[in-house]
Amino acid sequence: MLVWLAEHLVKYYSGFNVFSYLTFRAIVSLLTALFISLWMGPRMIARLQKLSFGQVVRNDGPESHFSKRGTPTMGGIMILTAIVVSVLLWAYPSNPYVWCVLTVLIGYGIIGFVDDYRKVVRKDTKGLIARWKYFWMSVIALGVAFALYLAGKDTPATELVVPFFKDVMPQLGLFYILLAYFVIVGTGNAVNLTDGLDGLAIMPTVFVAGGFALVAWATGNMNFANYLHIPYLRHAGELVIVCTAIVGAGLGFLWFNTYPAQVFMGDVGSLALGGALGIIAVLLRQEFLLVIMGGVFVVETLSVILQVGSFKLRGQRIFRMAPIHHHYELKGWPEPRVIVRFWIISLMLVLIGLATLKVR
């Protein structure tokens, strides 16, 4: 929005030309989202406390979590607000990739909001009925995926980028829709599963979004895209603004979510952020890179799948509790130790993922 305004004002004052620089807008997008989160935090927490929107804790969870009962949840509202406002201010409104991300972000945020509302108001730990949750998540994911397929059919926008192989970029055809669907829905649920400890989900989200900001910049720059042997996508550059907004909003939220948390993001935050990371990976044609950089989310999800599968097939559990972060809690690890070690692993995986762009 401000970019368009600056384009009209630059003829009166050349200094407004700074708004055309992607790096400048990326920095101010991050700072804008950060300050909005920090400003909203105390007000959001006070409002949630007044409404008695407190966390519902399962009775079969770790005993250390019982003290979290009643902590304000649905703090993801301030994350989404910060991201959306920052993106609308600093990104080109005409960019279709930006609107794809905002569609998934807001759509999944609404689904998460309904889920959280049922939990905190009706005191139902299950929240929104699973089949309805997945139905609406699927509708949004398939709708966006189908639109992207029609717009980018038989172009680099629907090719599959394979790590380590610079000349292997098969055209996916209709399989693109299926792949995009699983990436968006899967990542939304993966981040949701990871959000079980104070700050555990938000920092890996920040790391992955920061990594994708660099990838988006390279993908939207023809020279760097050719140098790295990745598809050049002319709309990809504006995703830098989206990614840095996620980073800023995430850091602002972490100020209040760090151990011991004053507020939880809830499903309104985790589903939305996961879906956003998923669609960003799809738009950049970096689904494999998401698996590497988001390895913490992948392991958390696999631990649940393996736990459920093992119990149904063998009647035995692999872990003391799933997702796997609870397993380490029950082994005696203090919560801050689990959180920080997962952060370290996440940062390492993001750096490894970025390195694969050059190893081709």
Swiss-Prot record:
The gene is mraY. It comes from the Bacteria. It catalyses: UDP-N-acetyl-alpha-D-muramoyl-L-alanyl-gamma-D-glutamyl-meso-2,6-diaminopimeloyl-D-alanyl-D-alanine + di-trans,octa-cis-undecaprenyl phosphate = di-trans,octa-cis-undecaprenyl diphospho-N-acetyl-alpha-D-muramoyl-L-alanyl-D-glutamyl-meso-2,6-diaminopimeloyl-D-alanyl-D-alanine + UMP. The chain crosses the membrane at residues 26-46, 72-92, 94-114, 132-152, 168-188, 199-219, 236-256, 263-283, 288-308, 338-358. Keywords: Cell cycle, Cell division, Cell inner membrane, Cell membrane, Cell shape, Cell wall biogenesis/degradation, Magnesium, Membrane, Metal-binding, Peptidoglycan synthesis, Transferase, Transmembrane, Transmembrane helix. This is Phospho-N-acetylmuramoyl-pentapeptide-transferase. Catalyzes the initial step of the lipid cycle reactions in the biosynthesis of the cell wall peptidoglycan: transfers peptidoglycan precursor phospho-MurNAc-pentapeptide from UDP-MurNAc-pentapeptide onto the lipid carrier undecaprenyl phosphate, yielding undecaprenyl-pyrophosphoryl-MurNAc-pentapeptide, known as lipid I. GO terms for biological process: cell division; cell wall organization; peptidoglycan biosynthetic process; regulation of cell shape. Its main location: membrane. It comes from Enterobacter sp. (strain 638). It is found in: Cell inner membrane. It is a multi-pass membrane protein. It is an enzyme of class 2 (transferase). Disulfide bonds: none annotated. GO terms for molecular function: metal ion binding; phospho-N-acetylmuramoyl-pentapeptide-transferase activity; UDP-N-acetylmuramoyl-L-alanyl-D-glutamyl-meso-2,6-diaminopimelyl-D-alanyl-D-alanine:undecaprenyl-phosphate transferase activity. The keyword S-adenosyl-L-methionine does not apply. GO terms for cellular component: plasma membrane. Belongs to the glycosyltransferase 4 family. MraY subfamily.
